[in-house]
Amino acid sequence: MQRRSNNERLVEYSPYRFDDPQFGHFDGTGQATMSWYIHRFKPFIDRNFRTLPDREHTFIGGSSMGGLMSLYALLQYNDTFSRAAALSPSIWVSPEKLSGLVGRAKLEPGTVLYMDYGSREMGNHDGMRCGFAEMCAKVMTRGIHLTSRIVPGGTHSEASWEKQLPFMFHTLMYEVEE
């Protein structure tokens, strides 16, 4: 298996172009990545494995840039995904464009989102808290069933995200009351 650099991951998992002071400019190809996933990969899996392919049984989840992509997928492809988990989503990449997508997304009833971040992530807790709170508020205005958490002592790491799995699964698996 070929290992990808962080820069390639930032390009593939960002639906938007963005500039990072540390790493430079990125032409986000996340829209193409998710289009491939929706139109090629998911149909292949549904044809070759015993799945429940309908929207009600199709969830997506990820952390960091994968969390950003999961949030993007829930909004952009809500006819495919009913639920998503976005652990430490990289909403800093393009908060304005993501907020615009939240505002114009065609959302089905019963859409569910779990979203969190750790209180010890990345060193800019105040900025992250404000961006996270703004995104949570915007999502809730659209009627998405949201569970959000700021994880005390949580860091931007696999070890921290692993501890959030019980909360994430509880949110994704419960019945939604309309």
Task: Kindly give the residue locations of the regions a language model identified.
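Non-catalytic cap/lid and distal C-terminal segments of serine-dependent acyl enzymes
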Residues: 1-178
